[in-house]
């Protein structure tokens, strides 16, 4: 997955600092982050516009087309840390009927980020 971002340094600070992802590679306006199971790439809006030979609009905050989700050990702690680091909160930690505790924040470019923790239920 490639996320289009306005400011690569700001996005890297969020994803490496606040979410703890490891920088795998950076070259100019492009970077890859190691999520553990896969890679998340970041590419600046201006560079992607040049690649596609078109102007790209920023995503609308009230109409997300997708979310980026990460599993964490403790949603409450991760949510508190993300908000303390400046991530705008969207939904506070909530137990979901599908067996997870989830919370949502926005990254510096307005992308919806979900953090999820599996709940252990007795059978």
Regions found by a protein language model. Give the residues of each.
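Short hydrophobic/aromatic beta-strand micro-patches
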Residues: 2-4, 69-71
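Ser/Thr-centric signal marking residues that sit
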Residues: 16, 38, 72
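Vicinal oxygen chelate
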Residues: 22-69, 77-106, 117-123
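Conserved active-site tyrosine of GNAT-family acetyltransferases
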Residues: 11-16, 82, 107-110
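N-terminal first-folded block
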Residues: 4, 9-29
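Short glycine-/small-residue motifs
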Residues: 112-115
